[in-house]
Amino acid sequence: MTTQLATDTELSAVNSILGSIGQSPITQLNLTNLQNPEIALVHNILMEVTKDVQNEGWHFNQEEHIARQPDASGHFTIPSNYLRFDVHDGLYDRTRDVVKRNGKLYDKVTHTDVFSGELYFDITYLFDFEDIPSAIQRYIIARSSVRAATQVVSNQELVQLLQLEEAKTLASAVEYDCEQGDHSFFGFPHESNYRSYQPYKALIR
């Protein structure tokens, strides 16, 4: 009988973390009734690391130049799944300097949270674990395993071994992010086009 491979779920991630610290796997993850304190701790670690990693900002959870309208009272209420919410081109346009205050966007230049019209934003989103790309999932699991080994087992040798795995998965995650983002050191912004010099084209006459 062959084993079918699939991307990670919260259950498989928790089991991977449990396995890394020498604990038995579980068959289901009942989030409304986690009676085992160790399982609850491991799941909490997974959720914390998921937020921490996404807070770093990756190609998969960042979007630029998103148009948003204020509500009827002129406020931009920040949704709970927004990790970062900043005005587009803020590096060049210093007429606005926005921060989160009382759950809404606040302009430190004009000293108000009331806006008169549409603005464009750069947004970093918070996704559920199962909506995260596999390469980033594996990094989250490895990083969570290190934290679990530190908090639950307190075995320094195990922590060091797991840190090696964390470094490998981080390298894979960064490689994935670079390939998906098509990043360039020239710093060309989104919605622009640039074709670099390609030597083979000199042969096309």
PLM regions: where:
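Glycine-enriched, solvent-exposed interface loops adjoining structured elements
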Residues: 1-205
